[in-house]
Amino acid sequence: MNIRTASFTFIVVMMILSQTMADRFFNEPEEDDHLVESWNPFKKIAHRHCYPKNECITTNGKKTCKDYSCCQIVLFGKKTRSACTVVAQ
């Protein structure tokens, strides 16, 4: 095997492995707490970004508000969709 074939094989294998790891983060945002914690030394590569969100609805002159806590995973600078949970009504 010459150097070009070895380099090409290495690049293909690295792309497959990185896609497999990224797929875990992007498809399972609710169940990945243990994965993010295991990546703590690599916070610049993968970390969780949480922020508060407030949503108010006015119905028949009565205003009701809900507070949410929304979190998303940032992996290599790309953000996943937010998963929000109700904190208070």
Curated annotation (Swiss-Prot):
Residues spanning the signal sequence:
1-22
Residue ranges listed under propeptide: 23-38
Q: Which residues form a coiled coil?
A: none
Lipid metabolism listed as a keyword: no
**6'-bromotryptophan carried by residues:** W39
Provide the alphabetized UniProt keywords. Antibiotic, Antimicrobial, Bromination, Disulfide bond, Fungicide, Signal
Kindly provide the PTM information from the record. Contains 3 disulfide bonds.
For the biological process aspect of GO, one term held by this record is: defense response to fungus
What's this chain's function?
Has antimicrobial activity against Gram-negative bacteria and Gram-positive bacteria with minimum inhibitory concentration (MIC) between 0.78 uM and 3.13 uM.
**Name listed for the protein in its UniProt record:** Strongylocin 2
**What species was this sequence derived from?**
Echinus esculentus (Sea urchin)
